[in-house]
Amino acid sequence: MPSLLITALFLNVIIYVINTVGAATVDGLLWLLYIQLPTGTSQIAREQRHMKREVVQLKHEMSSTSSQDEFAKWAKLRRRHDKALEAYEAKNNELTQSKSTFDITIKIARWAATSGLMLFLQFWYSKTPIFTLPPGWIPWQVQWVLSFPRAPMGTVSIQIWSGACATVVALVGDAMKASLAYVSKPKIDRIKLGATMEGKEGKKRQ
């Protein structure tokens, strides 16, 4: 069943990427994308940013105004600042509540679309072979393991295929990370060496 074979592989790749990047990072990126959409939450986010800039500006004006020499102006700025700060905190709390709801929703959706879907496929297609092995190719004991738990004898079950995909994806991913680290390390070493040489030359000039 090629479509099921590819689906299981694709899901394992997605799960590995999410685990490597970090679920919190993925959620943060999705939140940034979400508040760019034309929704009520994006309107709240824009208002919150505008209020924050206003509070910072008023605070800067207060700092540059003497409370002794220009008390009337300073007091007026203080009242405006306090009022703007109160409005900002209320809007920020509203945005925080929206983000909490979004985080819960996205966690459920992410699990359902990855691990939840994988569990469903393993249950629903437990009797469906991913592919059939050539007759007599391997001993029957190995065939039994590959068909575990409910696939026909002489085939590979989705559980075994999914486990194999997860292992291979993890190995390939770790190899890629190690290769990138190895390639980038000489550059970092050259930068450190250059900084050390410049420091030594500077000391010699002194």
Swiss-Prot record:
Residue ranges that the UniProt entry lists as topological domain Cytoplasmic: 25-110, 173-206
Transmembrane portions of the chain: 5-24, 111-131, 156-172
Membrane topology according to the record: Multi-pass membrane protein
Annotated coiled-coil segments of the chain: 75-100
Subcellular localization, as worded in the UniProt entry: Endoplasmic reticulum membrane
Molecular function (Gene Ontology), one example: protein-membrane adaptor activity
Gene3D superfamilies listed in its UniProt record: Helix hairpin bin
Record keywords, A-Z: Coiled coil, Endoplasmic reticulum, Membrane, Transmembrane, Transmembrane helix, Transport
Subunit structure: Interacts with GET3.
Role this protein plays: Required for the post-translational delivery of tail-anchored (TA) proteins to the endoplasmic reticulum. Acts as a membrane receptor for soluble GET3, which recognizes and selectively binds the transmembrane domain of TA proteins in the cytosol.
Family: Belongs to the WRB/GET1 family.
Annotated protein name in UniProt: Protein GET1
Originating gene: GET1
